[in-house]
Amino acid sequence: MAIIKDFAVVDLFCGIGGLTHGFITERFNVSVGVDFDNTCSYAYETNNNAKFLYKDVTELTANELNCLFPKNKRKILVGCAPCQPFSIFNYKNNNNVEKQAEDSKWKLLYSFADLIEATQPEIVSMENVPQLRNFNGGKVFNDFVERLETNGYFVSYGIFNAQDYGVPQRRKRLILLASKHSKFELIPPTHKDNYVTVQQAIGHLPEIKDGEHSEDDFLYFARKL
Protein backbone atom coordinates (compact mmCIF):
# COMPACT_ATOMS: atom_id res chain seq x y z
CA MET A 1 0.00 0.00 0.00
CA ALA A 2 1.27 3.48 -0.88
CA ILE A 3 2.48 5.80 1.86
CA ILE A 4 0.56 9.05 2.39
CA LYS A 5 3.46 11.25 1.31
CA ASP A 6 2.13 14.75 1.95
CA PHE A 7 2.18 14.39 5.74
CA ALA A 8 4.87 13.64 8.31
CA VAL A 9 4.15 12.61 11.89
CA VAL A 10 6.13 13.24 15.07
CA ASP A 11 5.02 11.24 18.12
CA LEU A 12 5.73 12.84 21.51
CA PHE A 13 5.74 10.68 24.67
CA CYS A 14 5.94 7.77 22.23
CA GLY A 15 6.88 4.94 24.62
CA ILE A 16 7.35 1.73 22.64
CA GLY A 17 5.28 3.13 19.80
CA GLY A 18 1.67 2.01 20.00
CA LEU A 19 0.33 5.22 18.48
CA THR A 20 3.18 5.32 15.96
CA HIS A 21 2.28 1.79 14.89
CA GLY A 22 -1.31 2.85 14.30
CA PHE A 23 -0.23 5.71 12.06
CA ILE A 24 2.15 3.46 10.12
CA THR A 25 -0.61 0.87 9.71
CA GLU A 26 -2.73 3.63 8.16
CA ARG A 27 0.15 4.45 5.74
CA PHE A 28 1.43 7.64 7.34
CA ASN A 29 5.13 8.44 7.44
CA VAL A 30 6.25 8.75 11.06
CA SER A 31 9.49 10.73 11.16
CA VAL A 32 10.44 10.16 14.78
CA GLY A 33 9.16 9.23 18.22
CA VAL A 34 10.31 11.21 21.26
CA ASP A 35 10.50 9.88 24.82
CA PHE A 36 12.74 10.30 27.85
CA ASP A 37 12.66 6.56 28.67
CA ASN A 38 15.55 5.19 26.66
CA THR A 39 14.60 1.59 27.43
CA CYS A 40 11.79 2.03 24.87
CA SER A 41 14.17 2.73 21.99
CA TYR A 42 14.85 -0.85 20.86
CA ALA A 43 11.20 -1.92 20.82
CA TYR A 44 10.13 1.35 19.21
CA GLU A 45 12.62 1.22 16.35
CA THR A 46 12.39 -2.55 15.81
CA ASN A 47 8.60 -2.68 15.68
CA ASN A 48 8.06 0.50 13.68
CA ASN A 49 11.17 1.01 11.57
CA ALA A 50 11.12 4.62 12.74
CA LYS A 51 13.71 6.73 14.53
CA PHE A 52 13.60 7.08 18.33
CA LEU A 53 14.82 10.30 19.95
CA TYR A 54 15.83 10.06 23.60
CA LYS A 55 14.71 13.45 24.88
CA ASP A 56 12.68 15.00 27.66
CA VAL A 57 9.76 16.76 25.97
CA THR A 58 10.01 19.61 28.47
CA GLU A 59 13.51 20.31 27.15
CA LEU A 60 12.61 19.99 23.46
CA THR A 61 12.72 23.39 21.76
CA ALA A 62 10.43 24.53 18.96
CA ASN A 63 13.38 24.72 16.59
CA GLU A 64 14.44 21.16 17.44
CA LEU A 65 10.90 19.92 16.90
CA ASN A 66 10.55 21.69 13.57
CA CYS A 67 13.80 20.07 12.42
CA LEU A 68 12.31 16.63 13.10
CA PHE A 69 9.77 17.18 10.33
CA PRO A 70 11.05 16.71 6.76
CA LYS A 71 10.96 19.84 4.65
CA ASN A 72 7.90 20.51 2.51
CA LYS A 73 5.74 18.09 4.49
CA ARG A 74 2.50 18.92 6.25
CA LYS A 75 3.00 18.43 9.97
CA ILE A 76 1.03 16.14 12.25
CA LEU A 77 2.00 16.31 15.93
CA VAL A 78 0.64 13.65 18.25
CA GLY A 79 1.20 13.05 21.92
CA CYS A 80 -0.08 10.86 24.73
CA ALA A 81 1.27 12.48 27.88
CA PRO A 82 1.66 10.13 30.89
CA CYS A 83 -1.76 9.27 32.27
CA GLN A 84 -0.81 8.40 35.87
CA PRO A 85 -1.83 11.77 37.41
CA PHE A 86 -5.33 11.47 35.91
CA SER A 87 -5.95 7.72 36.30
CA ILE A 88 -8.65 6.07 38.44
CA PHE A 89 -5.91 4.33 40.42
CA ASN A 90 -4.32 7.64 41.33
CA TYR A 91 -7.66 9.12 42.31
CA LYS A 92 -8.49 6.17 44.57
CA ASN A 93 -5.07 6.04 46.21
CA ASN A 94 -4.35 9.74 46.47
CA ASN A 95 -7.16 11.85 47.86
CA ASN A 96 -4.84 14.71 48.67
CA VAL A 97 -5.73 17.35 46.10
CA GLU A 98 -2.65 19.43 46.87
CA LYS A 99 -0.38 16.43 46.34
CA GLN A 100 -2.07 15.68 43.02
CA ALA A 101 -1.55 19.28 41.96
CA GLU A 102 2.16 19.01 42.75
CA ASP A 103 2.64 15.95 40.53
CA SER A 104 4.76 17.36 37.71
CA LYS A 105 3.57 14.75 35.20
CA TRP A 106 0.23 16.44 34.57
CA LYS A 107 2.10 19.61 33.62
CA LEU A 108 3.46 17.76 30.57
CA LEU A 109 0.18 18.55 28.84
CA TYR A 110 1.10 22.23 29.10
CA SER A 111 4.53 21.46 27.62
CA PHE A 112 2.73 19.74 24.74
CA ALA A 113 0.56 22.83 24.27
CA ASP A 114 3.65 25.06 24.28
CA LEU A 115 5.19 23.06 21.43
CA ILE A 116 1.96 23.10 19.44
CA GLU A 117 1.74 26.87 19.85
CA ALA A 118 5.36 27.35 18.79
CA THR A 119 5.39 25.01 15.76
CA GLN A 120 1.79 25.27 14.47
CA PRO A 121 1.34 21.76 13.01
CA GLU A 122 -1.65 21.38 10.71
CA ILE A 123 -3.08 18.48 12.70
CA VAL A 124 -2.81 17.61 16.40
CA SER A 125 -3.89 14.41 18.12
CA MET A 126 -3.95 13.63 21.83
CA GLU A 127 -5.10 10.57 23.79
CA ASN A 128 -5.42 10.05 27.54
CA VAL A 129 -7.60 8.51 30.23
CA PRO A 130 -11.16 9.90 30.56
CA GLN A 131 -10.39 11.30 34.03
CA LEU A 132 -8.28 14.01 32.41
CA ARG A 133 -11.53 15.69 31.37
CA ASN A 134 -12.38 16.53 35.00
CA PHE A 135 -8.92 16.67 36.57
CA ASN A 136 -8.46 19.75 38.76
CA GLY A 137 -12.04 20.76 38.08
CA GLY A 138 -11.53 20.39 34.33
CA LYS A 139 -9.00 23.23 34.25
CA VAL A 140 -6.07 21.29 32.74
CA PHE A 141 -8.04 19.89 29.81
CA ASN A 142 -10.02 23.09 29.24
CA ASP A 143 -6.80 25.11 29.20
CA PHE A 144 -5.40 22.75 26.56
CA VAL A 145 -8.49 23.03 24.35
CA GLU A 146 -8.64 26.81 24.76
CA ARG A 147 -5.03 27.22 23.69
CA LEU A 148 -5.66 25.15 20.58
CA GLU A 149 -8.74 27.18 19.66
CA THR A 150 -6.88 30.44 20.32
CA ASN A 151 -4.27 29.29 17.80
CA GLY A 152 -6.86 28.69 15.10
CA TYR A 153 -7.56 24.98 15.54
CA PHE A 154 -10.94 23.32 15.10
CA VAL A 155 -11.11 20.90 18.04
CA SER A 156 -13.07 17.66 18.33
CA TYR A 157 -12.93 15.26 21.27
CA GLY A 158 -14.85 12.52 22.99
CA ILE A 159 -14.61 9.49 25.25
CA PHE A 160 -14.44 6.22 23.35
CA ASN A 161 -14.58 2.57 24.43
CA ALA A 162 -12.26 0.21 22.55
CA GLN A 163 -14.87 -2.57 22.60
CA ASP A 164 -17.07 -0.41 20.36
CA TYR A 165 -14.38 -0.59 17.65
CA GLY A 166 -13.67 -4.31 17.51
CA VAL A 167 -11.17 -4.64 20.36
CA PRO A 168 -11.91 -7.51 22.78
CA GLN A 169 -11.42 -5.28 25.82
CA ARG A 170 -13.34 -2.64 27.75
CA ARG A 171 -10.96 0.33 27.68
CA LYS A 172 -12.19 3.90 27.64
CA ARG A 173 -10.01 6.73 26.40
CA LEU A 174 -10.37 10.46 25.86
CA ILE A 175 -9.34 11.21 22.28
CA LEU A 176 -8.83 14.68 20.83
CA LEU A 177 -8.24 15.69 17.23
CA ALA A 178 -7.57 19.24 16.09
CA SER A 179 -7.09 20.67 12.62
CA LYS A 180 -6.22 24.03 11.11
CA HIS A 181 -8.65 23.38 8.25
CA SER A 182 -11.98 22.10 9.57
CA LYS A 183 -13.57 20.18 12.40
CA PHE A 184 -13.01 16.41 12.41
CA GLU A 185 -16.00 14.11 12.41
CA LEU A 186 -14.96 11.46 14.92
CA ILE A 187 -15.54 7.86 13.84
CA PRO A 188 -18.81 6.42 15.19
CA PRO A 189 -18.82 2.98 16.88
CA THR A 190 -18.52 0.02 14.53
CA HIS A 191 -19.30 -2.87 16.90
CA LYS A 192 -22.10 -1.67 19.18
CA ASP A 193 -24.18 -4.81 18.65
CA ASN A 194 -21.48 -7.33 17.77
CA TYR A 195 -18.62 -7.05 20.22
CA VAL A 196 -15.52 -9.12 19.52
CA THR A 197 -14.95 -11.58 22.37
CA VAL A 198 -11.65 -12.77 23.80
CA GLN A 199 -12.53 -16.26 22.55
CA GLN A 200 -12.91 -14.93 19.02
CA ALA A 201 -9.62 -13.05 19.23
CA ILE A 202 -7.33 -15.70 20.72
CA GLY A 203 -9.40 -18.88 20.73
CA HIS A 204 -7.29 -20.31 17.91
CA LEU A 205 -4.21 -20.50 20.14
CA PRO A 206 -3.33 -23.99 21.42
CA GLU A 207 -4.21 -24.78 25.02
CA ILE A 208 -1.39 -24.59 27.54
CA LYS A 209 -1.46 -25.39 31.23
CA ASP A 210 -0.58 -22.96 33.98
CA GLY A 211 3.15 -22.49 34.22
CA GLU A 212 3.73 -23.60 30.62
CA HIS A 213 5.20 -21.78 27.61
CA SER A 214 4.17 -22.46 24.04
CA GLU A 215 6.79 -24.35 22.05
CA ASP A 216 6.04 -22.19 19.00
CA ASP A 217 5.89 -18.73 20.58
CA PHE A 218 7.93 -17.85 23.67
CA LEU A 219 5.70 -14.83 24.31
CA TYR A 220 2.67 -17.12 24.74
CA PHE A 221 2.62 -18.51 28.26
CA ALA A 222 0.38 -18.98 31.29
CA ARG A 223 1.42 -18.00 34.79
CA LYS A 224 1.76 -20.67 37.43
CA LEU A 225 -1.37 -20.84 39.59
Name each model-derived stretch.
Residues A2-Q120, P130-R133, K139-F141:
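Core alpha/beta nucleotide-donor-binding catalytic domains of modification enzymes
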Residues A2-V10, C14-F28, R147-T150, R173-L225:
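S-adenosyl-L-methionine-dependent DNA methyltransferase catalytic core
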Residues S31-G33, V124, G158, L205:
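Generic beta-strand hydrophobic packing signal
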Residues L53, P82, S156, N161-Q163, ...:
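Glycine-rich, flexible loop/turn motifs
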Residues T58, N161-Q163, I208:
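Short, solvent-exposed coil/turn elements at secondary-structure transition points
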Residues Q84-I88, L132-F135, G166-Q169, K183-L186:
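Short catalytic/ligand-binding loop motif for oxyanion handling, primarily in non-cytosolic enzymes
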Residues K105-Q169, L174-A178:
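Conserved Class I SAM-dependent methyltransferase catalytic core
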